[in-house]
Amino acid sequence: MNSKLVQPSYTAKKEDIKREWFLIDAKDYTLGRLASRIAKILQGKHKPTYTPYIDSGDFVVVVNAEKIKLSKDKKENKIYRRYSGYPGGLKEISFEQMQSKHPERIIQLAVKGMMPKTILAKHMMKKLKVYVGPDHPHQAQNPKEIKIENI
């Protein structure tokens, strides 16, 4: 085979990565659809320079986290569990309790579940900023407001 006909595979390099900031309003979006789109942006899968083993994703700011909705009857049935590692250390909290106490954690946990189960996911999750209400402290970064339908 002639080597001039074969294109070498492109691998993103650290200096080639340009990170953008995106703003997403979570009001009236379904949790799963929103989380999958956010995970795609954090991983950089929306870019043509995507490389699986390099963190090439962008920053995402999510506002109005308390106004997220779930499909069907999950609002009454969804339970969040965590385990301390000790006997009797299983704690359960319902979606409604979580929404009243920590609404930002709902989106963070959903996105975390859709990220790859690697050490790289921990670094990608640091680029997710979730806030209750319409205000956020990232005005200086000039985040681009996007609709999740366009991703």
Curated annotation (Swiss-Prot):
Coiled coil: none annotated. GO terms for molecular function: mRNA binding; structural constituent of ribosome. Gene3D superfamilies: Ribosomal protein L13 (3.90.1180.10). GO terms for cellular component: cytosolic large ribosomal subunit. The keyword Ribonucleoprotein applies. Part of the 50S ribosomal subunit. This is Large ribosomal subunit protein uL13. It comes from Petrotoga mobilis (strain DSM 10674 / SJ95). The lineage of its organism: Bacteria, Thermotogati, Thermotogota, Thermotogae, Petrotogales.
